[in-house]
């Protein structure tokens, strides 16, 4: 997913804009009654059960610093501030740091009351940590400490170092395994959310010399809560030499999305990935909100809703992800969930 990387001066100037009003309902006092603050914080961060309804936000929105009002994203249960890069926080992740501790606590409490977790997404299409020689353990330590410092519910690993994966020498997979292991050491399972956002083609069992995401899953899948699978051939935006009539329309029908991918990216439809050993409950279906959000893979909300209903009828319940707010809002997720998990 593409980071806008707004100039820091624009991000800094947004601090002076009014903090968006966040609507909320009172916390259920009985849930936290008798618990100390540490226990309350852990319960508030606890990993939610499927289905997961995830929305990313990287785009500058005038008048809003950090997350929007809860009413704007009702129906989602995870909001990903994007992106934390190897160089530091940018865009929505940076905006979060500019709020005072009291403001962050207020927003966090209101999102928690609405059942929405706040996480940070890291890397995106801008960072190429393996190709750049970044130490995975050191970087994981830095990023995990950032999550803790800024009181978020977890971290999403949107790794898009395509050159490293294409090399087929296993370095990308080894980097991800080390990075994930260290993240989970510092962000314990059940207390913090840890997700990955791979593109669907990386789950192919026949293409990647280093083993691809199936190797990553075999090594550390037990540490990853779920995968926000970018079933949008997003790498095609970056690697035009992979464009073909077949690839450009990949994952745009329910059959292609759920049961049988094309020969361009073999065995990467939802149920095919599950057949390769990844639990269905961990495979969240990711799509762009608009035709402008990605060069391919777009589905209308009605078509996507139909696909989700079909998947649910076959035992799937993982949920859906969208790139990004404000292209998608409460209305988008209400339409997408209408036939399967209505809001």
Short names for language-model regions:
Residues 1-34, 40:
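Fungal secretory targeting signals
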Residues 27-273, 277-303, 314-315, 330-336:
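Chitinase-like catalytic core of GlcNAc-active glycosidases
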Residues 287-289, 322-325:
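Glycan-recognition surfaces
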Residues 310, 314, 319-320:
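Structured C-terminal cap/extension of enzyme domains
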Residues 321, 328-343:
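C-terminal helix/juxtamembrane-tail motif
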């Amino acid at each position: 997913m593409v980071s806008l990387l707004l100039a820091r001066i624009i991000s800094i100037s947004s601090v002076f804009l009014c903090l968006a009003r966040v609507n909320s309902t009172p916390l259920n006092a009985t849930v936290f009654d008798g618990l100390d603050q540490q226990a309350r914080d852990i319960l508030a961060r606890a990993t939610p059960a499927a289905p997961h309804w995830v929305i990313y936000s990287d785009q500058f929105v005038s008048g809003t610093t950090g997350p929007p009002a809860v009413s704007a994203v009702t129906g989602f249960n995870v909001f990903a501030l994007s992106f934390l890069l190897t160089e530091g926080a940018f865009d929505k992740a940076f905006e979060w740091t500019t709020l005072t501790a009291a403001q962050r606590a207020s927003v966090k409490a209101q999102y928690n009351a609405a059942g929405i977790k706040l996480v940070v997404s890291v890397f995106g299409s801008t960072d190429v940590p393996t190709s750049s020689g970044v130490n995975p353990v050191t970087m994981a330590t830095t990023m995990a400490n950032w999550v803790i410092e800024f009181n978020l519910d977890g971290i999403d690993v949107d790794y898009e170092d395509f050159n490293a994966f294409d090399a087929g020498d296993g370095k990308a997979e080894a980097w991800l395994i080390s990075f994930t292991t260290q993240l989970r050491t510092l962000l314990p399972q059940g207390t913090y959310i840890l997700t990955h956002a791979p593109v669907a083609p990386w789950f192919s069992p026949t293409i990647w010399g280093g083993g691809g995401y199936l190797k990553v899953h075999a090594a550390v899948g037990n540490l990853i809560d779920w995968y926000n699978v970018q079933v949008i051939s997003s790498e095609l935006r970056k690697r035009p030499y992979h464009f073909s009539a077949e690839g450009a329309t990949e994952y745009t029908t329910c059959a292609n999305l759920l049961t049988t991918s094309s020969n361009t990216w073999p065995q990467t439809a939802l149920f095919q990935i599950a057949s390769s050993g990844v639990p269905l409950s961990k495979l969240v279906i990711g799509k762009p909100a608009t035709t402008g959000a990605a060069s391919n893979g777009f589905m209308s909300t009605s078509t996507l809703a139909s696909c989700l209903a079909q998947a649910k009828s076959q035992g799937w319940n993982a949920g859906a992800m969208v790139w990004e707010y404000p292209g998608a809002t409460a209305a988008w997720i209400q339409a997408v969930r209408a036939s399967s998990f209505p809001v």
